[in-house]
Swiss-Prot record:
Keywords: Leucine-rich repeat, Repeat. Belongs to the LRRC42 family. This is Leucine-rich repeat-containing protein 42. LRR repeats lie at residues 167-188, 195-215, 227-248, 252-273. Residues 360-390 are annotated as: Disordered. The gene is lrrc42. Residues 362-375 have a biased composition (Basic and acidic residues). InterPro entries: Leu-rich_rpt (IPR001611), LRR_dom_sf (IPR032675), LRRC42 (IPR039631). The keyword Mitochondrion does not apply. The keyword Secreted does not apply.
Length: 417
């Protein structure tokens, strides 16, 4: 009876588990060991992708390291310097910089090149703001000479950017079709253009009214283009003898070109120019008016080329002429050609004006001690209005800070970070 009750007790009690030496076993079962699988949080094929803040995928993000190859041909990873990373960060946000006054010129040039490579000067509003940060702080380093000869499309499309350039020494606006009412002509008499020493306005449809507006600040206030030494007004038929009188305010003028204008009394005009300014007529062509040495110089030299190429690429060539001819041939409306022998009407020949050579230069002055002493006495007793204005300008403190330059040791220290 004991044997019969034992299996019933075993069934009621259930399985008995025993752990021995870290192994779990069941008493009285055929499988002495239970295989326990490790608990996995994820399956083998599970992968995790970290998604951060969504950014603009159209912009290529530069990685903070550089790929280079060694002499053996193996690929080498080198991290960018802290200076390079900082330069890229500032160039990406150059329009938000308050001012660049006081920064060294070498760093500013690298920053300008980096911003130009990122096309930060192309945007209509932010590009102009970024460009003004450099022109206000560095002046003629951005551009000292600007040649816009025949580039009237660039003048019309980038007028505000051109007006932002300060401390220019040479400006060539020949063949730009400005006219008397152009905004850039009025800008020439402003204070930012007072550093101009060479100005070329050949073939711009100027008249006496435009010359009067351009020289108003010099004649009345004694400032503006008061440092001008070379002036080219040739090929402007609207300039007459009356317009020449407005040029007498340029006391430092050394070279003047009035060729192909509408001067009716050359002999009388020559006498006025010689007595008022001290210029005499040159029998030979003056090399200053050959336009061979005039070119764009400064940090923004490549920027102007990119502007012009962008404007020219936007202008698509007109292909309507071929389609128009094809349509005329299809409908049988070809253009009638008038035979040469049956000409009942002939166009008059264009009137060719006689070219006049009127180039003036200042001869070398011979020093006369008596005349110099008398001139000094006259200036000591009487002060002119222009002298007062110049004295006031000299007393006024300059707004621009002195430029800071880095030495070779400073560059070594900067590149070591």
């Amino acid at each position: 009876m004991f044997q019969c009750l034992e299996p019933e007790r075993n069934e009621e009690a259930g399985l008995v588990y025993v752990r021995e030496k870290g192994k779990l076993s069941v008493i009285g079962s055929h499988s002495s060991e239970l295989r326990t699988r490790p608990c996995r949080l994820f399956s083998k094929g599970f992968s995790v992708e970290l998604c951060g803040k969504q950014e603009d995928t159209s912009k290529h993000r530069q990685k903070p390291f550089i790929f280079t190859y060694t002499k053996e041909g193996s690929l080498r990873y080198s991290a960018k310097s802290l200076f390079t990373l900082t330069l890229e960060l500032i160039s990406d946000n150059i329009q938000y910089v308050d001012s660049l006054m006081g920064f060294p010129d070498q760093i500013a040039e690298k920053l300008f090149t980096a911003a130009e490579a990122k096309q930060k000067f192309y945007a209509p509003c932010s590009g102009l703001m970024a460009l003004r940060k450099f022109t206000e702080a560095y002046g003629d380093l951005v551009l000292s000479s600007l040649c816009l000869r025949g580039r009237y499309l660039l003048v019309s499309e980038r007028l505000e950017e051109i007006k932002s350039f300060q401390c220019l020494h040479s400006l060539d606006l020949s063949c730009c079709k400005l006219g008397d009412e152009h905004e850039l002509l009025a800008h020439l008499s402003s204070d930012p253009m007072s550093s101009l020493t060479e100005l070329y306005l050949k073939d711009n449809c100027l008249s006496n009214i435009g010359i009067q507006k351009m020289t108003a600040s010099v004649r009345v206030l004694g400032r503006g283009l008061d440092k001008l030494k070379v002036l080219d007004l040739s090929s402007n038929p609207g300039i007459t003898d009356r317009g020449v009188c407005f040029l007498f305010g340029f006391k430092l003028l050394k070279f003047l070109d009035l060729s192909d204008t509408s001067i009716q009394d050359p002999s009388g005009t020559l006498k006025k120019i010689e007595t008022k300014i001290g210029l005499v007529l040159s029998k030979k062509s003056i090399f200053q008016f050959d336009h061979t040495n005039c070119r764009t110089q400064g940090w923004a030299e490549q920027l102007l080329e990119q502007w012009e190429s962008y404007i020219l690429s936007a202008i698509k060539p007109k292909d309507t002429l071929k389609s128009r001819n094809a349509a005329q041939q299809f409908y049988g409306k070809e253009k009638k050609q008038i035979p040469s022998d049956s000409g009942t009407f002939t166009l008059p020949a264009p009137v060719v004006q006689k070219q006049t050579h009127l180039q003036f230069f200042r001869p070398k002055e011979q020093k006369d001690p008596d005349s110099s002493n008398s001139e000094k006495r006259r200036h000591s007793t009487k002060r002119t209005g222009a002298d007062c204005v110049q004295e006031d300008c000299s007393i006024a403190p300059s707004t621009k800070r002195p430029r800071v330059t880095l030495t070779s040791s400073d560059w070594d220290l900067l590149n070591s970070y």
